[in-house]
Amino acid sequence: MEFLGELIYDAEGLVLGRLASIVARNLKRGYRVKIVNAEKAIITGDPNMVKKEWLQKVKRGDYYKGPFYPKRPDNILKRVIRGMLPRKTARGRELLKNVKVYIGVPEELKDKPKLGLNLENAKGYPEALIKEVLKAKPKFERGNIKYIELGELSKYLGAKFT
C-alpha cells in the first residue's frame, strides 16, 4: 500500500468515537496516523453511566480466555479505532499497525503541526483535513453537556499512567 503521508492528531477535547471514525477513514485512505494527548479525549454522556458501562466491559469474561479490554487511555483509544477497521483481514491488521497513540506529547512530536481544536497548530495541513477534524468537536452549543475525559475513566478502571 502506498502511503500518502503522516497525520498527527491532538485528541484534547475531541469526542472519542468521532475522532476514531475520522482516523479509521484516513487509515483506509493511506495515511499513517499518530494521536497525542489520548487521556484528554472525551466520552459524552453521564459520567456515572459511562464508568458503569466500561467497568462492566473490563470485568466481563475470564482472566485466561477474555475478552480483554484495556484500561490505559492510549490502549482504549486504539481499541476503539480497531473496532472501526476490518481487523480480521490482512489489510485491516496492516492498517492497525499504522496507528500510534500517545499519552501526552512525546518530545519528537512537540514542534510538529497537529490537527485538533487549536487551529493555529494545524499549519501545513490541507483545509479538507482541518474541516474534517472539527466534526469531532463536541456540540456544546445545545447547552451543558455531560462528559468524562478518557484519563479520568482510565483511573477509575484502575489504570496507572502518567
Curated annotation (Swiss-Prot):
InterPro entries linked: Ribosomal_uL13 (IPR005822), Ribosomal_uL13_CS (IPR023563), Ribosomal_uL13_euk/arc (IPR005755), Ribosomal_uL13_sf (IPR036899)
GO terms under cellular component: cytosolic large ribosomal subunit
Pfam families per the UniProt record, alphabetical: Ribosomal_L13
SUPFAM superfamilies in the cross-refs: Ribosomal protein L13
Keyword Ribonucleoprotein in record: yes
GO MF, one annotated term: structural constituent of ribosome
GO biological process, one term: negative regulation of translation
Keywords per UniProt: Ribonucleoprotein, Ribosomal protein
Subunit: Part of the 50S ribosomal subunit.
PANTHER family: LARGE RIBOSOMAL SUBUNIT PROTEIN UL13, RIBOSOMAL PROTEIN L13
Family, as annotated: Belongs to the universal ribosomal protein uL13 family.
Cited function: This protein is one of the early assembly proteins of the 50S ribosomal subunit, although it is not seen to bind rRNA by itself. It is important during the early stages of 50S assembly.
The protein's name in its UniProt record: Large ribosomal subunit protein uL13
Gene behind the chain: rpl13
